[in-house]
């Protein structure tokens, strides 16, 4: 394969090509998901990549759930189908010798909703618009040194721990008189710790996070919505078939998030578990994607019951 096919490789000797091929597949699968809307990460999202790398992502998510688009807020009797599209940009850089990154996500949702008990309306309602913008700050704690593309080509992946802070701004479409909104009309912060270790051709990854919510003072009219933290942990066990293909088994567990409306606790603490699988692929050293599926296998009464298909395409340069 010529350097025209690997445009980053012009400064890398042919005996380093194997490492460079690893660079392209890792670089295009890192920092790669939409944990937006209380969804989980994907496998290999937080592995190391070279510094000064730009990445753009496009997502299509098909979601069937008993919640609004903000999946931290189940509503009794609700059945919602959503087509969620997300544009995402990420750039990596060095801080104090460790790899860091900043990401920006802008979702758009097209939804249809109905109620089994006609609690709020009859029939099916449709809505579409922009969801809340997210900014993500990422910094490696160990196992992810800041490396140029040439240095990364000769580097062997190692056990790592990375921290991230997700900030969700209330920029999405919101109407206080609607039952089902696309925006959440509140700030949210999600600190996250991601751990991963390579085991031969496999990766074992464990992530933990907590979602912290601001108040919504215009909830279903002029009521005030408060919510306790929602805690989550997830695991991924992935296998590398070759430099252009890997697959993963995924699991997620969430607990907490009880809400209070105008000072009255709603006795709706959430608890659910999801299982899924995913497959990442590369079509060229810069262009690739992912297909993923997850489904709720156990949930406490009143908790989120979510079924999600995800298609992601990404390009790195």
Which ranges hold each PLM region?
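Outer-membrane beta-barrel pore domains and translocons
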Residues: 59-63, 105-109, 140, 166-170, ...
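Repeated loop/turn-to-beta-strand initiation elements of outer-membrane beta-barrel proteins
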Residues: 66-67, 97-100, 144-145, 201-204, ...
């Amino acid at each position: 394969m010529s350097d025209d096919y690997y445009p980053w490789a012009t400064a890398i000797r042919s005996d380093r090509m194997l490492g460079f091929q690893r660079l392209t597949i890792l670089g295009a699968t890192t920092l790669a998901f939409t944990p937006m809307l209380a969804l989980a990460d994907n496998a290999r999202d937080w592995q190391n990549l070279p510094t000064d790398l730009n990445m753009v992502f496009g997502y299509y998510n098909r979601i069937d759930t008993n919640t609004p688009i903000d999946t931290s807020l189940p509503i009794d009797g609700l059945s919602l189908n959503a087509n969620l599209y997300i544009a995402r940009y990420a750039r990596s850089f060095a801080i104090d010798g460790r790899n860091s990154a900043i990401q920006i996500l802008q979702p758009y949702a097209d939804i249809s909703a109905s109620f089994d008990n006609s609690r709020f309306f009859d029939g099916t309602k449709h809505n579409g618009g922009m969801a809340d913008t997210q900014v993500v700050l990422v910094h490696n704690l160990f196992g992810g040194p800041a490396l140029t593309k040439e240095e990364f080509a000769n580097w062997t992946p190692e056990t790592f721990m990375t921290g991230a802070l997700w900030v969700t701004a209330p920029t999405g479409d919101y109407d206080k008189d609607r039952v089902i909104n696309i925006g959440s009309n509140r700030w949210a912060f999600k600190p996250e710790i991601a751990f991963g270790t390579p085991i031969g051709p496999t990766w074992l990854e464990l992530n933990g996070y907590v979602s912290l919510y601001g108040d919504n003072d215009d909830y279903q009219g002029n009521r005030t919505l408060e919510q306790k933290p929602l805690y989550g942990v997830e695991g991924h066990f992935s296998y590398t078939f070759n430099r252009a293909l890997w697959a993963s088994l995924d699991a997620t567990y969430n607990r907490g998030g009880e809400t209070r409306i105008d000072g009255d606790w709603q006795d709706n603490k959430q608890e659910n578990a999801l299982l899924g699988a995913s497959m990442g692929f590369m079509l060229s050293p810069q262009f690739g994607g992912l297909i993923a599926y997850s489904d709720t296998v156990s949930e406490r009464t009143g908790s989120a019951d979510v079924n999600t298909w995800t298609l992601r395409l990404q390009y790195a340069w």
